[in-house]
Curated annotation (Swiss-Prot):
Function description: Catalyzes the transfer of CoA to carnitine, generating the initial carnitinyl-CoA needed for the CaiB reaction cycle. Also has activity toward crotonobetaine and gamma-butyrobetaine.
Similarity field: Belongs to the ATP-dependent AMP-binding enzyme family.
Name of the coding gene: caiC
Lineage of producing organism: Bacteria, Pseudomonadati, Pseudomonadota, Gammaproteobacteria, Enterobacterales
Gene3D superfamilies documented for this protein: 3.30.300.30, N-terminal domain of ligase-like (3.40.50.12780)
Record-given protein name: Crotonobetaine/carnitine--CoA ligase
One Gene Ontology biological process: fatty acid metabolic process
GO molecular function, one term: carnitine-CoA ligase activity
InterPro entries the UniProt entry points to: AMP-bd_C (IPR025110), AMP-bd_C_sf (IPR045851), AMP-binding_CS (IPR020845), AMP-dep_synth/lig_dom (IPR000873), ANL_N_sf (IPR042099), CaiC (IPR023456)
Enzyme class: ligase
EC number: 6.2.1.48
């Protein structure tokens, strides 16, 4: 089934400008409270100017351009400006340091970088010490260093005409983006995303939350992440809705932003829900227009119920990863929801549970979650310049091995158990980190929790818990272990406890477990 009809991203924006014109398309709020608004017509013009800027700097179809930016209008301009001329965006996690950023530059073959003064010193060092193909840097800030090969993004953009100067032939199968995975367990891999992928993501994600053109979709997720791009931005734009992009998440400011922009859809991860719950209760907690809160793993039922009750919202669960582009398993609009299920397979997808020999398992049995899609259309095309890694996870007929464990019930509802790499082998028993974390997270003194397996000469692995306490709380080892013994099987009780001020996380809020082992 082809729901795109040969329309690439250039055609999408030209059509959106014609159809929605002066309707608000994009609102960006900076951490300093500066708000920029663009209509669909104005945004398309800014995208065209940005495309022309890249063309004047020698960027042509197939060239790679890296973006190292926090959430800002320039990210949106560059994303679609590059797509309009057939160039390829390479977003870099804005929290990465020199070595990691240099590695992505080298492995993506990016020849131009758009960044801000905040990150520029790091790239000066990269240019001096690392072998990359980078030949020019555009800075989004007004003040510029007196360096060769550096120019002002804003000044160059504002000099460009609002109509597109370079429009090479485009196909929906053309690559629009190479998005490097967060790499919590190994080196990041470049996920190749096509024009078709992004167009499909927009329609699919709009369907998933029944998005309309009078909706306002607010997100604080980072723009360099697949959730922001494909679950939020592409959905909002494809439906002609208003997309609100907040620069950075603040638990204190979040509900005020939801109310100020009259948001009807937003998205949350567990870290956000937990930090929102520790904010002082307010009479305004339920004063909002949210219809759906898109939610991504993992949360205990007690935490979910408390959040929904306090704020008067419901969670729409969505399960996916960079390689699936969208939440390929999730709750459906208008359908029943069955917590803690992650939902059912969405349209255009098949899903099943397989054993270690790649054989389908019956309902109720735990195995690997596998998804069938169409590479380059409904799932990623490949890993960039890495056919071995591609072949490891993607079968020739479109079956994708997620590396996650779960099971399915008789009605087709799927249940997530854990990442395979997060299963602890303890004395012959398999222990799910997520299961333990959900239990421990219900302790009233604990704000955040992660458990990992550490080497044990007798039991294969021992379990260690890292916890962050709520402000002003203290927790003794005796109290912690007693709580665990009362709430889980004996073989699941952690052997060690470490209390920390925070936990290492990547840009999408996922805990980087390898930093704790």
């Amino acid at each position: 089934m082809d729901i795109i009809g040969g329309q690439h991203l250039r055609q999408m924006w030209d059509d959106l400008a014609d159809v929605y014109g002066h309707k608000t398309a994009l609102i960006c709020e900076s951490s300093g409270g500066v708000v920029n608004r663009y209509s669909y017509l104005e945004l398309n013009q800014e995208i065209n100017r940005t495309a022309n800027l890249f063309y004047t700097l020698g960027i042509r179809k197939g060239d790679k351009v890296a973006l190292h930016l926090d959430n800002c209008p320039e990210f949106i301009f560059c994303w679609f400006g590059l797509a309009k001329i057939g160039a390829i965006m390479v977003p870099i996690n804005a929290r990465l340091l020199r070595e990691e950023s240099a590695w992505i530059l080298q492995n993506s073959q990016a020849c131009l970088l758009v960044t801000s003064a905040q990150f520029y010193p790091m790239y000066q060092q990269i240019q001096q010490e690392d072998a990359t193909q980078l030949r020019h840097i555009c800075l989004t800030d007004v003040a510029l260093p007196a360096d060769d090969g550096v120019s002002s993004f804003t000044q160059l953009k504002n000099q460009q005409p609002a109509t597109l100067c370079y429009a090479p032939p485009l196909l929906t199968d053309d690559t629009a983006e190479i998005l490097f995975t967060s790499g919590t367990t190994s080196r990041p891999k470049g996920v190749v995303i096509t024009h078709y992928n992004l167009r499909f993501a927009g329609y699919y994600s709009a369907w998933q939350c029944a998005l309309r053109d009078d909706d306002v979709y607010l997100t604080v997720m980072p723009a360099f992440h697949i959730d922001c791009q494909c679950t939020a931005a592409m959905a909002a734009f494809s439906a002609g809705a208003t997309f609100v992009l907040v620069e950075k998440y603040s638990a204190r400011a979040f509900w005020g932003q939801v109310q100020k922009y009259r948001a009807t859809i937003t998205e949350c991860i567990p870290m956000m829900i937990r930090t929102l719950m520790v904010q002082p209760p307010s009479a305004n907690d339920r004063q909002h227009r949210l219809r759906e809160v898109m939610f991504y793993l993992n949360l205990s039922e007690q935490e979910k119920d408390a959040f929904c009750e306090r704020f008067g919202v419901r969670l729409l669960t969505s399960y996916g990863m960079t390689e699936t582009i969208v939440g390929i398993i999730g709750d459906r609009p208008g359908d029943k929801r069955r917590w803690p299920s992650i939902g059912r397979a969405g349209f255009c997808y098949e899903a099943e549970i397989r054993d270690d020999h790649n054989r389908p398992l019956p309902a109720g049995e735990i195995g690997e979650i596998c998804i069938k899609g169409v590479p380059g259309k409904t799932i990623f095309k490949e890993y960039f310049l890495n056919p071995k890694a591609t072949a490891k996870v993607l079968e020739a007929d479109g079956w994708l091995h997620t590396g996650d464990t779960g099971y399915c019930d008789e009605e087709g509802f799927f249940y997530f158990v854990d990442r395979r790499c997060n299963m602890i082998k303890r004395g012959g028993e398999n222990v799910s980190c997520v299961e333990l974390e959900n239990i421990i997270a219900t302790h009233p003194k604990i704000q955040d929790i992660v458990v990992v397996g550490i080497k044990d000469s007798i039991r294969d692995e021992a379990i260690k818990a890292f916890v962050v306490l709520n402000e002003g709380e203290t927790l003794s080892e005796e109290e912690f272990f007693r709580f665990c013994e009362q709430n889980m099987a004996k073989f699941k009780v952690p052997s060690y406890l470490e209390i920390r001020k925070d936990l290492p996380r990547n840009c999408s809020g996922k805990i980087i477990r390898k930093n704790l082992k």
